[in-house]
Amino acid sequence: MARRCDICGKGPLVGNNVSHANNKSKTRSLPNLRSVRATVDGTVKHVRVCTRCLKAGKVVKVAHGASRASARA
């Protein structure tokens, strides 16, 4: 499973750790992803969303057990 936000597409960044002797080793900076139950096209799905999209309100979270309550009614 890719470490990528399902909403904005944010993924890992690649860079270098540079020592005083100018030796370089690769480093990866991963996005802060959360697995969230959200409504997508009217259905409840698990999506991986970065915290920036969560704070911006781009995702409508579903309360735990809400899909079962609607199925009973």
From Swiss-Prot:
Recorded GO molecular functions are: structural constituent of ribosome
List the GO biological process terms: translation
Pfam families found in the cross-reference section: Ribosomal_L28
Cross-referenced InterPro entries: Bacterial_rp_bL28 (IPR050096), Ribosomal_bL28 (IPR026569), Ribosomal_bL28/bL31-like_sf (IPR034704), Ribosomal_bL28_bact-type (IPR001383), Ribosomal_bL28_sf (IPR037147)
Q: Which Gene3D superfamilies match?
A: Ribosomal protein L28/L24
Q: Which HAMAP family match?
A: Ribosomal_bL28 (MF_00373)
In the record, the note on similarity to other proteins reads: Belongs to the bacterial ribosomal protein bL28 family.
Protein name from the UniProt record: Large ribosomal subunit protein bL28
List the gene name. rpmB
